[in-house]
């Protein structure tokens, strides 16, 4: 069975997230999703939605076979435990594919890295766009 791992914060779930996960699922047989812990989100504003609620929403998606919260101290721990063939990253995730491949190799984790393209089928495909539009509408 070919396992795929997708990772993300998934704050304010939107069509871009669904596209990312559905495209990830197409690469294998079993999709595992690692949902970022609140304390580990340091590259952007803290999530609005709690980690438990974000996990529950991801678990409810048809394309997701398994979803877990990330480890609070070692982001590679769940990846080692899942042992995926492929790790996908979203088009706007800050990862460099080369750096991630090097980090995985350094830890003896044998997984390919695939960046999923941007979804452009709808206007609100990022949490930031949704928040900005909500603020704009509320402050008119």
UniProtKB/Swiss-Prot annotation:
Pathway assignment: Cofactor biosynthesis; FAD biosynthesis; FAD from FMN: step 1/1
Record-listed E.C. numbers: 2.7.7.2
Any single GO BP term: FMN metabolic process
Record GO terms (molecular function): ATP binding; FMN adenylyltransferase activity
Function: Catalyzes the transfer of the AMP portion of ATP to flavin mononucleotide (FMN) to produce flavin adenine dinucleotide (FAD) coenzyme.
Assembly information from the UniProt record: Homodimer.
Name the record gives this protein: FAD synthase
Species assigned in the record: Methanocorpusculum labreanum (strain ATCC 43576 / DSM 4855 / Z)
Name of the coding gene: ribL
């Amino acid at each position: 069975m070919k396992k795929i791992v997708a990772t993300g914060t998934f704050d304010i779930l939107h069509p871009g997230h669904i596209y990312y996960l559905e495209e990830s699922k197409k690469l294998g047989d079993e999709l595992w999703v690692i949902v970022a812990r609140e304390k580990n989100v340091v590259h952007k504003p803290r999530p609005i939605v709690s980690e438990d609620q974000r996990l529950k929403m991801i678990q409810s998606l048809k394309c997701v076979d398994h979803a877990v919260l990330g480890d609070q101290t070692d982001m590679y721990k769940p990846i080692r435990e899942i042992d995926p063939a492929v790790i996908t990253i979203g088009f706007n995730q800050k990862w460099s594919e080369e750096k991630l491949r090097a980090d995985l190799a350094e830890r003896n984790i044998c997984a390919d890295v695939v960046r999923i393209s941007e979804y452009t089928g709808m206007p609100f495909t990022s949490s930031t766009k949704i928040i900005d539009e909500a603020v704009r509408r509320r402050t008119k």
